[in-house]
Amino acid sequence: MTAAENVCYTLINVPMDSEPPSEISLKNDLEKGDVKSKTEALKKVIIMILNGEKLPGLLMTIIRFVLPLQDHTIKKLLLVFWEIVPKTTPDGRLLHEMILVCDAYRKDLQHPNEFIRGSTLRFLCKLKEAELLEPLMPAIRACLEHRHSYVRRNAVLAIYTIYRNFENLIPDAPELIHDFLVNEKDASCKRNAFMMLIHADQDRALDYLSTCIDQVQTFGDILQLVIVELIYKVCHANPSERARFIRCIYNLLQSSSPAVKYEAAGTLVTLSSAPTAIKAAAQCYIDLIIKESDNNVKLIVLDRLVELKEHPAHERVLQDLVMDILRVLSTPDLEVRKKTLQLALDLVSSRNVEELVIVLKKEVIKTNNVSEHEDTDKYRQLLVRTLHSCSVRFPDMAANVIPVLMEFLSDSNEAAAADVLEFVREAIQRFDNLRMLIVEKMLEVFHAIKSVKIYRGALWILGEYCSTKEDIQSVMTEVRRSLGEIPIVESEIKKEAGELKPEEEITVGPVQKLVTEMGTYATQSALSSSRPTKKEEDRPPLRGFLLDGDFFVAASLATTLTKIALRYVALVQEKKKQNSFVAEAMLLMATILHLGKSSLPKKPITDDDVDRISLCLKVLSECSPLMNDIFNKECRQSLSQMLSAKLEEEKLSQKKESEKRNVTVQPDDPISFMQLTAKNEMNCKEDQFQLSLLAAMGNTQRKEAADPLASKLNKVTQLTGFSDPVYAEAYVHVNQYDIVLDVLVVNQTSDTLQNCTLELATLGDLKLVEKPSPLTLAPHDFANIKANVKVASTENGIIFGNIVYDVSGAASDRNCVVLSDIHIDIMDYIQPATCTDAEFRQMWAEFEWENKVTVNTNVTDLNDYLQHILKSTNMKCLTPEKALSGYCGFMAANLYARSIFGEDALANVSIEKPVHQGPDAAVTGHIRIRAKSQGMALSLGDKINLSQKKTSL
C-alpha cells in the first residue's frame, strides 16, 4: 500500500494567499503570547508541518510553553500536532523530548475531565511508537473502569489498536476485554468490546455469545448488528456451526431495529436454503418494505426479493407470498409500485392468480376514485398491463378482467385507455369464447369514448369481430348515434342559420353611445362580436372529431362500415334489407366526403383519406369475392400473425432469461460432500461483508484479465510530456455517481519541489468534490494524488487543469505545467433498457431535444452497421429481429437506453443502401436522437460520430 492510499486522519484547509510565517515569529508567539496568540501560532505550525516543513527548533518550545496549558482548544490542537510531528531521529530512535510528552499523555489519561481522557485515548489509537505507549499501559487499563461510557468506549478502542499493532504490550487484552464485556452495561461499550473480540479472539467472542444467546433480542441494535456479522463470518468459515447459531438469527428477525432485521434476513438466506428460512427472510423483507417510509429503502429491499426470486428453489417459496408482496402497493411511490407489480407477475402461478387478479381489480377501481394525478394515470397503466399479462398467461382469468378494464376505454387519460384497447384487441383475437362478451361491453362504452385514437381502435374491433346480424345492426346504430343528423353539411348549416335568428332580434335593443379618442361618437351593439355557437361538447363524439378536421377516423369508419356491410350481405338473404344496409353505409361515407370538401371543418380532408373512403364506396358498389376476402379474412390474419410473432418473441426472451438463471453443472464437475471437504474448501461463496466493504472503498474486483481492453492500463491517460519537469499520468476509475482520478506525479528534476499542487477544473455537469492538498517532492521522487469528481448527469465532461509548484531555494515565481484534457466517456453511465412501442412514441413526442446525425461510414451491410451503432452507444434495439431480417435495401430501427440517473435516450436509425452504386456501396441515411436534456442528445451524437470515424479509418 502506498503512502497516498493510507488512511488520512487530518485534513486541514490551507489558505493559498497567506504568507508563510517565519520560525522566529512563531517561537516568539508560542513563548510570550497569550492563549489566543499561542492557539493561532500552533495552527500555523501544524499547517507548515503538513506542507513538509520540519521545524525541529519549535518542538522544545511547544513542550515548555504550550504543553502545560489547560485550555481545551490548545489540547485538541496538541493532539493533532503530536500526531503529525516527527517523533524519531533520522536513524529511527525516539527523540529524548518525547519522554516529556509521554508524561503529559499520562496526566491527560488521569485528567478529571472525561472529554480530555476520551480524546487522548482516541489519539493513542494513531500512535505507532511502542516506546511511547509502554509507560501509558497502566493508565489505559485504568480507563476501563472510568464512570463515564465515553472514556470506557475509547479505552476499548485504544486497547484493541495497541494489541493489534504491539501484542507484547498487552498480551492479556482478549481476556481483559472479555471480563469487561461480561460486566459492562452500556451498549456502545459492549459493541466496541465485542467487535474487538471478533477480530482478536473469535473463540472468546463465541463463548460470550453462547452464554447470552437467549438475551440477544434485548441488546441494543449496534451490538445486534455486530452479532449478526460474527455469526455470518463464523458460519461462512465453518458451515458446521450453522445449526448452533441459526436460531439466534431467527430471533434477530424480530428485532425492533430495521437495520438489524435487514442484515439478519440477508445472513439467514446465505446460511440456509431451507424453505422455512427463505420464507422467514422474505416475510421480514416484505414487512420492512411496508413499514419503512423511505422509498430508497423500499427499492433496495425489493431488489433483495428480486435476487431471491432469481434462485429456482427460492422462487417456489416466494410464490406463496405473492399476496403479501402485493401489500406493498399501498405505497404511493410509482417506482416502488412498478417493481412490486413486476415481481408479483414473475411469481404468479395458477394457484394464486385468481387472488392476484381480485387485488389488482380493486386497485384499478381505487385509481378511478382518486383525484386525477400524473402518477395515478401511470399507475393505472401499470395495473392494466399487469392484468393484460395475467390474462394472456392464464386465459381463464380474462373473463373476470375484461368487464372491469373496458370501463376505462372512456377514460380521459389516453395512454391508459390505449393499454386497455391493446389488451382487448389481443383478448378478442385469442379467446373465441369471450368475443360475444367483449363486443357487448364495447357497444356499451362506445358512445362514451373521448379520445379519437381510442375511437379508431374501437371501430376496428367492432368492424372485425361483429359476426351476428344483431351485433352488426347495433354497430350501425351506434355509428349513426355518434355521427348525429345527416347529411352533416346541411344539418350544420341549418343549425347555424337557426341560431342566428334570436341574435337578429337582439340587435334592435338599445344602443349605448361611446366617445372615442378622436372625440367622435361611436355606437356599441348589444350583439356580441363573436356569435355564440352550440357548445362543442354537445356534439356527438364522431361528429365532433370530423368537424375538428380529424378525417383519419373517417377512413377507419369507412373500412368498418365496409366490413360489416359485406358481412351483413352474407348473413341476410333478403335483397331489400341487403340493399338498404349497404346504401346506408354508402350514405354515411358520402356525407363524410361532402363534409371534408366543405368549409365547415377546421382542417380539410386529406387526399389519402379521400382515396380510402372512395375505395370503400367502390368495394360496396361492386361487392367482388376478392374484396370480400381481403376485408373479412386477410385483415384478421395479419393481426393473428402480428400477435403470434409478439408471443414468440416474448417466449424467446423468457427462455434466454431462464437459461441465464439456471446454473449449468457439467458432467465432470466434482460433487461436494460437506463431511469430506477440507475446512478451507468448505464454502465457495464469497464473503458478503468483505465484498460490500470493497465496493464502498471503490475497490470492487472486476474480471479484467479475460479482456485486456477492459484492464486498468487501458484507462491510463498521459497528462504531461516526458520532457516536462513534472510528469503526470492518471488512471480514471469510474464509479456509479463519481469519478476517482488516481494521478501519478513524478519530479523529473534534481530540485526539491515545494507546494506541488494539482489544480483541476471541470467542464460539463461535473463537480470537483475537494481540492487536492499540496505536497513536497524530493528530487526524482514521485507521489500519488487522488481527486474525486462528482457526476450529476449523463453528459460528455472534460476535466482539465495544471500542476503548479515552487522550486526550493529559487526566487522565481511559481512554475506551472499545463495538463492534457481528460474526456469522460458517457458510455460508463448508459445502460440498455426496454420500453413498449407506445411508451417510445410518447417519449418521442414529449422530448424536445433532437440531434440528427448523418451516416458517414464505409460499412456496406445494413445489419452490420446497426450492430456497430448498438455496440458504440450501449443502446438496445426495440425493433424485433424478424422485422430486421431479410434484405430489402433499407432499414429502420428504434433504439432505447437509460442512464443511471434515470434519463431516457431514444434513437431512430433510418438507413439504406443505394442500389445504383452497386453491391459495394456504403450505407447512407441518418440517425435521430431524442432526449429530455440537450447534453444527453449532443453527447450521444458525438459518440456516434466518433465511432463512425473509427470505422471509416
Swiss-Prot record:
Keyword Protein transport belongs to the record: yes
Pfam families tied to this protein: Adaptin_N, Coatamer_beta_C, Coatomer_b_Cpla
GO biological process, one term: endoplasmic reticulum to Golgi vesicle-mediated transport
Chief place of localization: cytoplasm
HEAT repeats: 96-131, 132-168, 240-276, 277-314, 316-353, 396-433
Post-translational modification: Proteolytically cleaved between Ser-528 and Ser-529 by CAPN8.
UniProtKB keywords: Acetylation, Cell membrane, Cytoplasm, Cytoplasmic vesicle, Endoplasmic reticulum, ER-Golgi transport, Golgi apparatus, Membrane, Microsome, Protein transport, Repeat, Transport
One of the record's GO cellular component terms: COPI-coated vesicle
InterPro entries assigned: ARM-like, ARM-type_fold, Clathrin/coatomer_adapt-like_N, Coatomer_bsu_C, COPB1, COPB1_appendage_platform_dom
GO molecular function: structural molecule activity
N-acetylthreonine, modified sites: 2
Cell membrane among keywords: yes
Topological category with respect to the lipid bilayer: Peripheral membrane protein
Subcellular location: Cytoplasm; Golgi apparatus membrane; Cytoplasmic vesicle, COPI-coated vesicle membrane; Cell membrane
Residues the record lists as N6-acetyllysine modifications: 494
Function according to Swiss-Prot or TrEMBL: The coatomer is a cytosolic protein complex that binds to dilysine motifs and reversibly associates with Golgi non-clathrin-coated vesicles, which further mediate biosynthetic protein transport from the ER, via the Golgi up to the trans Golgi network. Coatomer complex is required for budding from Golgi membranes, and is essential for the retrograde Golgi-to-ER transport of dilysine-tagged proteins.
Something else known: Brefeldin A induces dissociation from the Golgi of the beta-COP and presumably the other coatomer subunits.
Quaternary context: Oligomeric complex that consists of at least the alpha, beta, beta', gamma, delta, epsilon and zeta subunits. Interacts with SCYL1. Interacts with CAPN8. Interacts with COPG1. Interacts with ARF1 (myristoylated); this interaction is required for binding of COPB1 to Golgi membranes. Interacts (via trunk domain) with ARF1 (via switch I region); the interaction is direct. Interacts with KCNK2 (via N-terminus); this interaction increases the channel-mediated whole cell currents and promotes plasma membrane expression of KCNK2. Interacts with PRKCE. Interacts with STX17. Interacts with TMEM115.
UniProt-recorded name of the protein: Coatomer subunit beta
Organism: Rattus norvegicus (Rat)
